[in-house]
């Protein structure tokens, strides 16, 4: 029963990891697209700069920065998953050694 629980845990960890990688990839693409749009818009407005436009762009870039903060959290989650898998590998190696 414990082995089956461990197997389900590994499966869930794998699913969680894949989903996290997908979310990171999706978020990176989204942020890249938004940053590209902002830079293109900024270039278009170089000749027509106004304080209002600058403030709007600053707020949008702050949004991009918030998105990057989210990405940092995702990478921290990935690091935690790595630590969990390392710990599991050590326990598995220990269990295998005990069985020999």
Swiss-Prot record:
Subcellular location as annotated: Cytoplasm
A GO CC term attached to the entry: BLOC-1 complex
CDD domains linked to this entry: BLOC1_CNL1 (cd24144)
Domain of life: Eukaryota
Coiled coil ranges: 25-46
Entry keyword Amino-acid biosynthesis: no
Biological process according to GO: endosome organization; regulation of protein localization
Disulfide bonds: none
UniProt entry keywords in alphabetical sequence: Coiled coil, Cytoplasm, Transport
Quaternary assembly: Component of the biogenesis of lysosome-related organelles complex-1 (BLOC-1).
Function in brief: Component of the biogenesis of lysosome-related organelles complex-1 (BLOC-1), a complex that is involved in endosomal cargo sorting.
Family membership: Belongs to the BLOC1S4 family.
Protein name as it appears in the record: Biogenesis of lysosome-related organelles complex 1 subunit CNL1
Species in which this protein is naturally found: Candida glabrata (strain ATCC 2001 / BCRC 20586 / JCM 3761 / NBRC 0622 / NRRL Y-65 / CBS 138) (Yeast)
Taxonomic classification: Eukaryota, Fungi, Dikarya, Ascomycota, Saccharomycotina
């Amino acid at each position: 029963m414990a082995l089956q629980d461990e197997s389900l845990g590994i499966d869930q960890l794998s699913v969680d990891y894949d989903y996290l990688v997908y979310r990171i990839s999706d978020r990176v693409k989204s942020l890249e697209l938004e940053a590209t749009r902002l830079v293109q818009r900024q270039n278009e407005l170089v000749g027509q700069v106004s304080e209002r436009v600058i403030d709007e762009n600053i707020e949008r870039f702050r949004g991009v920065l918030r998105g990057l903060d989210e990405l940092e959290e995702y990478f921290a989650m990935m690091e935690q998953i790595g630590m969990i898998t390392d710990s599991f590998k050590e326990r598995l190696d220990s269990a295998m050694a005990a069985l020999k």
